[in-house]
């Protein structure tokens, strides 16, 4: 497989990663099927638990193989298998730097329980002492309550890192992408 810089590879994830050179990837983002029983057009999302976990271990090992020593691996997953996939990732050798909750407003409508309106985003690295995080990049900083609300002089004038609960609403993103000039 020809893996050019800044390209998206399309195909079976394990086969596609097996075609990549070992240690050639800076960032891997996985949003695998949640295995919650939905029947999609091209995929039946209802494997037996053990089969799903074995498949997950297979593709997580493939991620580990292609990731550079200082690379980053993000995993987006629902509630059903979040804990299991975190443990599998750690058993393979990944270190969890952050467990982020992504809150969204388009959750599945439920009639017998509270509506689920979040997903889990795990931030993994291979080496807890050698990884890229860009915490000094001002674009990654947000104002703090210490600064905005309390006018506390101890606040970092450059802001602070965001919380581990992210509110991302697709409507907000679309609004930012469409300008008044686009008509």
Please report, for each region that a protein language model flagged, where it lies by residue.
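Core catalytic lobe of class I
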Residues: 1-183
């Amino acid at each position: 497989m020809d893996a050019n810089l800044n390209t998206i590879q399309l195909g079976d994830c394990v086969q596609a990663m097996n075609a990549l050179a070992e240690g050639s990837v800076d960032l891997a983002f996985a949003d695998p099927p949640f295995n919650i029983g939905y029947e999609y057009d091209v995929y039946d999302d209802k494997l037996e638990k053990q089969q799903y976990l074995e498949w997950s271990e297979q593709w997580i090992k493939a991620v580990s193989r292609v990731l550079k020593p200082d690379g980053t691996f993000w995993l987006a997953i629902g509630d059903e298998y979040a804990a299991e996939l975190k443990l599998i990732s750690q058993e393979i050798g990944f270190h969890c730097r952050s467990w982020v909750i992504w809150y969204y407003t388009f959750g599945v409508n439920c009639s017998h329980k509270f509506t689920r309106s979040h997903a889990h985003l795990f931030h993994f690295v291979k080496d807890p002492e050698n990884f890229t995080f860009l915490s000094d990049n001002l674009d990654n900083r947000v104002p703090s309550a210490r600064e905005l609300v309390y006018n506390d002089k101890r606040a970092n004038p450059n802001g602070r890192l965001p919380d581990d609960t992210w509110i991302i609403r697709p409507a907000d993103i679309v609004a930012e992408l469409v300008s008044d000039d686009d008509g």
